[in-house]
Amino acid sequence: MSEEQLKAFIAKVQADTSLQEQLKVEGADVVAIAKASGFAITTEDLKAHQANSQKNLSDAELEGVAGGTIGGTIVSITCETCDLLVGKMC
């Protein structure tokens, strides 16, 4: 798994509004967009990241989600092909 590549891609998406817009398009292919941006990630990387992210939520993050409010910006990447959501609160 290329966790470093995925983390680097997420960081780039957070800083690049053009990438954010590309990923918001319905049916956007996250892996293809990442590849076009110079990152080598796979669907398996996205699945593993999602599984790990769900396991590692803090109590504050869980409370924020349950309450419907989060005091930060959430950058999310949705893979329409595999129906995954990769997100990070900043």
From Swiss-Prot:
Indicate the principal place this protein occupies in or around the cell.
Answer: secreted
Q: Which residues form the propeptide?
A: 1-68
Q: Cross-link position, Beta-methyllanthionine (Thr-Cys)?
A: 78-82, 81-90
Encoding gene per record: ProcA1.7
**Source organism lineage?**
Bacteria, Bacillati, Cyanobacteriota, Cyanophyceae, Synechococcales
Which keywords does the record carry? Secreted, Thioether bond
Instruction: Relate the induction remark in this record.
Output: Down-regulated under nitrogen starvation.
Q: Which GO terms describe its cellular component?
A: extracellular region
UniProt xrefs under Pfam families = Nif11 (PF07862)
Q: Where is this cross-link: Lanthionine (Ser-Cys)?
A: 76-79
Modified how:
Cross-links are proved in vitro, when coepressed in E.coli with the ProcM lanthionine synthetase.
> This chain belongs to which protein, by name?
Lantipeptide prochlorosin 1.7
Q: At what positions is 2,3-didehydrobutyrine found? A: 69, 73
This chain's function reads: Lanthionine-containing peptide (lantipeptide) with unknown function. Does not show antibiotic activity against Lactococcus lactis 117 and Bacillus subtilis 6633 bacteria. Organisms that produce this peptide live in oligotrophic environments at very dilute concentrations, suggesting this peptide is not secreted to influence other bacteria.
The places in or outside the cell where this protein is found are: Secreted
